[in-house]
Amino acid sequence: VAQPIIIIKENQALVELTTRDLSFINERNLSRIFHEVAEAGLEIHLMQTSAVTFSMVVDHKPERITHLEKTLSQEFIYEEKTSLRLITVRHATPAMLERFRAEHAIWFEQTSDVTTKLLVLASEE
């Protein structure tokens, strides 16, 4: 049985981009978003796509995030939430995940086979 590994990234930002005309997020939209993320020198730590919204978690680097807002706000409704912490747990036990969920208000959660990522307010302990 693998031992749990916990990685905590402080000072994270959640950026949500919603199509202005409520059309679906498609490959063209994603290509544009990824291009601007690369131009800004940001790395996406967590992402999710819904029908009309693309959400991503990046390091909160104001000058770089401002670039995203300036370049993407014409095409998308831009929303940003800061003061967040990203907790990544590999090989978590069910009890460990329950404890994290009980101790934090979860803004965003993503689970794969062996990894769970939880986005929480940084002020929470």
Region spans (language model):
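A conserved regulatory-domain signal marking ACT and ACT-like small-molecule sensing domains
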Residues: 1-125
